[in-house]
């Protein structure tokens, strides 16, 4: 099974990003250029517009650490309220503030860039922008020469790597680059494993869930025509969902349907029908017999019976 080609949106300029970047540069006023109000100025005086503009920048960027904390808190609230565009703007602001506080070559800046990339992918559905910022985050981490000062920082870097490589992997998958997608997703998986081991059984607040990463690995395996491996990943994802949300959650519907497609490609039509039956049963129990979800599940089930050579099937 091959994924249908999709149009990848491209943007020649990112207005929000450019504005924030230049704003961050404006705040870095060298010591020798700062005006001392107690001493007379030499040369021509600043215009009123220049003074107001400078005051606006200084006011906007006062106490950057506090503003960063406020933005990070606001992002969670906006995402919860499904205000994705506003949340993405706050992510851009976090990158700007991180540049000011830590510098462009610090891992904290890479963390902000990786989070922005993940936001472009999951909140906005813009793979091109997601890839650009993920690559920037990757370059920062590769060239960073500092050292971590605590166990907490090491865990945060691992979290950043999980998110970074997951984003790159999914973007590659959307662009039909199966091998590159699987390569990046494997890196994300290794970092997630290391992170979970560092918590020693405790919970870690990852933005990328184990289920999402496992599904992405399954799809990447499928894109590379590794059907058996894809099946292993999808079955693992099903087990994860059942363990966390039970065996009647709507999240299982798409998973069962994707597993059924894999089984059809493996010529295991009976197995495919069983999975589609499970998906249909969940749709009927959660919605109604005549709901769009149940109708779609029923159509897939009928198609599976036709492919297996059956003329009739029992609902």
Swiss-Prot record:
GO terms for cellular component: centrosome; cytoplasm; midbody; spindle. Keywords: Coiled coil, Cytoplasm, Cytoskeleton. The keyword Metal-binding does not apply. InterPro entries: TPR-like_helical_dom_sf, TTC23/TTC23L. Residues 28-56 are annotated as: Disordered. The keyword Coiled coil applies. It is found in: Cytoplasm, Cytoskeleton, Microtubule organizing center, Centrosome; Cytoplasm, Cytoskeleton, Spindle; Midbody. Its main location: cytoplasm. Residues 65-90, 179-200, 250-280 form a coiled coil. PANTHER family: TETRATRICOPEPTIDE REPEAT PROTEIN 23 (PTHR14485), TETRATRICOPEPTIDE REPEAT PROTEIN 23-LIKE (PTHR14485:SF4). This is Tetratricopeptide repeat protein 23-like. It comes from Bos taurus.
């Amino acid at each position: 099974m091959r994924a249908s080609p999709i149009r990848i949106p491209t943007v020649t300029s990112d207005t929000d990003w450019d504005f924030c970047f230049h704003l961050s540069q404006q705040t870095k006023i060298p010591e020798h250029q700062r005006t001392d109000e107690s001493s007379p100025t030499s040369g021509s005086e600043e215009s009123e517009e220049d003074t107001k503009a400078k005051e606006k920048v200084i006011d906007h960027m006062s106490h950057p650490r506090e503003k960063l904390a406020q933005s990070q808190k606001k992002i969670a609230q906006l995402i919860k309220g499904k205000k994705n565009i506003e949340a993405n703007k706050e992510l851009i602001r976090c990158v700007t503030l991180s540049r000011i506080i830590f510098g462009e070559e610090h891992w904290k800046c890479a963390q902000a860039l990786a989070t922005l990339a993940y936001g472009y992918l999951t909140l906005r559905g813009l793979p091109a922008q997601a890839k650009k910022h993920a690559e920037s985050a990757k370059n920062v981490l590769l060239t960073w020469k500092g050292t971590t000062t605590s166990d907490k920082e090491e865990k945060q870097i691992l979290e950043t790597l999980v998110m970074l490589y997951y984003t790159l992997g999914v973007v590659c998958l959307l662009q039909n680059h199966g091998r590159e997608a699987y390569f990046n997703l494997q890196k994300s998986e290794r970092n997630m494993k290391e992170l979970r081991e560092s918590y020693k059984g405790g919970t870690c607040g990852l933005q990328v869930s184990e289920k999402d990463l496992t599904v992405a690995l399954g799809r990447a395996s499928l894109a590379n025509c590794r059907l058996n491996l894809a099946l292993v990943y999808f079955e693992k994802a099903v087990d994860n969902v059942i363990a966390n949300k039970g065996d009647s959650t709507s999240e299982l519907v798409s998973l069962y349907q994707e597993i059924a497609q894999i089984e059809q490609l493996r010529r295991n039509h009976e197995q495919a029908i069983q999975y589609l039956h499970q998906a249909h049963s969940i749709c009927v129990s959660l919605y109604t017999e005549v709901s769009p979800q149940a109708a779609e599940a029923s159509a897939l089930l009928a198609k599976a019976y036709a492919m297996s050579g059956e003329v009739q099937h029992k609902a």
